[in-house]
């Protein structure tokens, strides 16, 4: 522990906070061939692989994921939320931050209902998170 004299000479340094979604922090300048710091809530990318993954220990399932090559050059694993999807290799997707606790290495979510990703079919509740349109009311 630091003495009072040491604390008078030098302040305590704040701990550096690391980003939980680093791929959203940079953009790529193709003219200068450099990455520049430019944080954004979403990034566009192209699926290079779509598959399933088994979760960590107490859970059991086949979770859908996609490996996405982003416009800034990063290649990340992103979770595909909801039941059923239409994604395949070369699909253009939008990703946002947000990890999946039981899938190691998956730190991003794919936004449903944008670009090549369709919304979840027959979704009635919590539709906004799954890109589902409001169902038509039947007239009597």
Curated annotation (Swiss-Prot):
A single GO BP term for this record reads:
translation
Which InterPro entries does this one have? NA-bd_OB-fold, Ribosomal_uS12, Ribosomal_uS12_bac
Read off the Pfam families from this record: Ribosom_S12_S23
Q: Name one GO cellular component term.
A: small ribosomal subunit
Region named Disordered: 36-56, 117-140
Q: Which domain of life is it from?
A: Bacteria
Does the UniProt entry include the keyword Transferase? no
User: What are the GO MF terms of this UniProt record?
Assistant: rRNA binding; structural constituent of ribosome; tRNA binding
Could you tell me the keywords of this UniProt record?
A: Ribonucleoprotein, Ribosomal protein, RNA-binding, rRNA-binding, tRNA-binding
Family stated for the protein in its record: Belongs to the universal ribosomal protein uS12 family.
Function (record text) = With S4 and S5 plays an important role in translational accuracy. Interacts with and stabilizes bases of the 16S rRNA that are involved in tRNA selection in the A site and with the mRNA backbone. Located at the interface of the 30S and 50S subunits, it traverses the body of the 30S subunit contacting proteins on the other side and probably holding the rRNA structure together. The combined cluster of proteins S8, S12 and S17 appears to hold together the shoulder and platform of the 30S subunit.
Self-association and partners:
Part of the 30S ribosomal subunit. Contacts proteins S8 and S17. May interact with IF1 in the 30S initiation complex.
Give the protein's recorded name. Small ribosomal subunit protein uS12
Where does this protein come from, organism-wise?
Answer: Malacoplasma penetrans (strain HF-2)
């Amino acid at each position: 522990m630091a003495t009072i004299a040491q604390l008078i000479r030098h302040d305590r340094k704040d701990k550096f906070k690391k980003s939980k979604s680093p791929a959203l922090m940079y953009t790529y300048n193709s003219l200068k061939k450099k990455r520049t710091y430019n944080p954004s809530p979403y990034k566009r990318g192209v699926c290079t692989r779509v598959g399933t993954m088994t979760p960590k220990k107490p859970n059991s399932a086949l979770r859908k994921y996609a490996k996405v090559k982003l416009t800034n050059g990063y290649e990340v694993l992103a979770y595909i939320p909801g039941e059923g999807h239409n994604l395949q290799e070369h699909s253009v997707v939008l990703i946002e931050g947000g990890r999946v606790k039981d899938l190691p290495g998956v730190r991003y979510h794919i936004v449903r209902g944008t670009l090549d990703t369709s919304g979840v079919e027959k979704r009635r509740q919590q539709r906004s998170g799954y890109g589902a349109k409001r169902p038509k009311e039947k007239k009597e």
